[in-house]
Each structure stands twice: as C-alpha cells, then as structure tokens.
C-alpha cells in the first residue's frame, strides 16, 4: 500500500508539471527585486566573492548551512545586482556562530545548519526585512520558492549578476531515497524539486532559503550532479524540525541541543 501511494503521488506530480513550461538557480528567472528582502549573500573578506546564501530571520540573526562556514565571513544584506549597489545595502560580520554539529563534522544528509548572530543588528529598509520561521511543516506537493546567486548552468560555473528564483515542489522523501542510495531511512531534511528536472538549486546556492507560503521551510543543502537532472531532487535541511533549537539559541540558551 505504501508503494502504491508513493507511485500515485509521483504520477499526480508528473501530470501537474507536464503542463508547465520550463523556465530558463537552474531553470529559474531573475527574482523580482522586492521578493527577496530576507536573502543574504555570504562571502569572505579576502575573496570578496560570495560562496553561499543565507536567510535573515530577525534583525540580528541569519540562518544558513553548516557547509557555508568560513573564517572571516562577511554578510551582505539588501543586495540585488552584484554590479549595482542599492542605497540600503548593509554589510555585517558574525558576532557568534552556532551549529548542531561542528561545521566540519555535519553529514550531508543531517544537521547541515548554521545560525549566525550579527555583530550589529540590521535596519529594515526597502530591500531588507526578515522572513518568518515556519508555524507548521510544509505539505507534500506544496509549491515553494528557491532563490540565489548560484550558477545558472548545469555544466559550467555561470553565475548571474542578480539572484534567480524558481518554483519547485515538496516531494515525498522516498523520491530522494530512490535517487540517492546512501540516504538513511529517515532524516531531518526535505526532498524538493521537479521530477522531470530542469529546475534546481546549484553551486553557490547552498545555505539559501526554501520559501513556502511566506515562511522559510528549508535550507539549501545538497543534490545531484549535474544540477537539475530528472528524478534527482535537492535535499534541504528541515527548518521546522530545528525550530526549538533555533528559538532557544536566539533566547540566549547557548547550550541548547539539536534534535537527535
């Protein structure tokens, strides 16, 4: 019965996607300048080139992936074009960083999460505002939004000047287990993508948000290579499962433990 239910879900999703034209993140379009006020870019002082994204969840805290940790991180907020600076762009450095596991010992299918406390709070502005944490986990089949300055080519590193956005769907975790043999039977990750491929997060999008109904439900973690292959969805750290840890850290409990 479980197998029949999974196959039925896959068929429904495939039929619904077949009527949608592929958009040319991978398979995305330039984000509207006003839809990503919570999106931040992470880069290092020396390189001055971003390597990851993150999500502003209040004036003092940014959510990203553990894999995005670096020394001398700089955080740029309010940015759209990397070539044209908005008047309200703000740059911050971390005051503290928190992990479920060490940034060196997380696994790619579990606990890929980093919480950054900014040295100075940011001010809300035309292009800067936090996004809400989830009130409930996302439903299977939910249409969600991914965004970032990651490569827009599956075969070569082609980074856009502006963030790209794409709509993808929450898929049954069994779809990702079928795609990636080493995935455990259960994990605190979301499986999301497009079954026929063509839309996906890719290199440079790590740490960025998966937005469902105006709430950050996932953190870009990892996926197939090349990006955007059929039946190779992406894996996203499930924010809802880490909600108690996030709220405890923000409240000042530095000894808070992550879910097992």
Curated annotation (Swiss-Prot):
Similarity annotation: Belongs to the peptidase S1 family. Snake venom subfamily.
Disulfide bond residue pairs: 31-165, 52-68, 100-258, 144-212, 176-191, 202-227
SMART domains recorded: Tryp_SPc
Originating organism: Trimeresurus stejnegeri
UniProt-recorded name of the protein: Snake venom serine protease homolog 1
A matching Pfam family: Trypsin
Keywords from the named record: Disulfide bond, Glycoprotein, Hemostasis impairing toxin, Secreted, Serine protease homolog, Signal, Toxin
Matching InterPro entries: Peptidase_S1_PA, Peptidase_S1_PA_chymotrypsin, Peptidase_S1A, Trypsin_dom, TRYPSIN_SER
Segment forming the signal sequence: 1-18
UniProt-listed GO biological process terms: proteolysis
Free-text function comment from the UniProt entry: Snake venom serine protease homolog that may act in the hemostasis system of the prey.
Glycosylation-annotated residues: 83, 123-124
Location of the Peptidase S1 domain: 25-251
GO cellular component terms, semicolon-separated: extracellular region; secretory granule
Subcellular localization(s) per the UniProt record: Secreted
UniProt note on tissues of expression: Expressed by the venom gland.
GO molecular function: serine-type endopeptidase activity; toxin activity
Lineage: Eukaryota, Metazoa, Chordata, Craniata, Vertebrata
Propeptide: 19-24
């Amino acid at each position: 019965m479980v197998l029949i239910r999974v196959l039925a879900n896959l068929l429904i999703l495939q039929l619904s996607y077949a009527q949608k034209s592929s958009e040319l993140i991978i398979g995305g379009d330039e984000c509207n300048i006003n839809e990503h006020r919570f999106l931040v870019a992470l880069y290092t002082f020396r390189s001055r080139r971003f390597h990851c994204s993150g999500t502003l969840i209040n004036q003092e805290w940014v959510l990203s992936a553990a894999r995005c940790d670096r020394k001398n991180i700089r955080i740029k907020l309010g940015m759209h074009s990397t070539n044209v600076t908005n008047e309200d762009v703000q740059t911050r450095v971390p005051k503290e960083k928190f992990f479920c596991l060490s940034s060196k010992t997380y696994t790619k299918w579990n606990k890929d999460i980093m919480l950054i406390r900014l040295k100075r709070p940011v001010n809300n502005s035309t292009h800067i505002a936090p996004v809400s944490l989830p009130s409930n986990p996302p439903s299977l089949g939910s249409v969600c939004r991914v965004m970032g300055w990651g490569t827009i080519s599956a075969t070569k590193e082609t980074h856009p000047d502006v963030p790209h956005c794409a709509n993808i769907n929450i898929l049954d975790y069994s779809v990702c287990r079928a795609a990636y043999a080493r995935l455990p039977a259960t994990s605190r990750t979301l499986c999301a993508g497009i079954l026929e491929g063509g839309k996906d997060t890719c290199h440079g999008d790590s740490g960025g948000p998966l937005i469902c109904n105006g709430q950050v439900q996932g953190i870009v973690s990892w996926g197939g290579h090349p990006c955007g292959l059929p039946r190779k969805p992406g894996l996203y750290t499930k924010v809802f499962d880490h909600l108690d840890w996030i709220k405890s850290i923000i409240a000042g409990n530095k000894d808070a433990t992550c879910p097992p």
